[in-house]
């Protein structure tokens, strides 16, 4: 089912400050990177494309690097990895590999990529942040991003394609929401056009099934990191389960005092 969320029926008790800040940070980072190519210093055509490629290899999470703990040496990069015209623009740089999943969470490949991610984060992050509190929500979000990145690396240990996007972290938010508020009503669109209100478990459950089936199909040429989505979602479900049990244990009151 091709569905996009628009809003849910949950009245938040506090302003989702962290969710808003995450959205703002993602948008700002996208606008100032070569991927958006809005700054004239990135040039046009081949120069711009090379700036994008070089930028991603310097900052994005790369499976092979994550598992080895070291950046790929320049002499191992060739035309099959980086387009020939761009190789000359690469210089040896110091890359802190363990931080690359953090950087990658704020990088996106296109306008559609970031808009879709931010829409899901806005709709579902508000509820999860309200339940967890600001600090723990941020910690969980970052943890989801790391888990999804390293999970993706385990499925493609020799991969050299840069992994970018907040999708893995947001998948964790979706998984947590599914356990926190499965019967919540979400306003969405079917096939991106037809508005419909449905239970959260229907929309999120179908989303996860779609990611799983796409992962199993392992479509050639598909640039979507389905494994990252699956790992992130499962991590989020575990957190959501803990939240539900904590709420039951303490009578449904305020879950955490952290803000």
Predicted regions: what is each one?
Residues 1-259:
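A detector for small-residue-rich transmembrane helices and their helix-helix packing motifs
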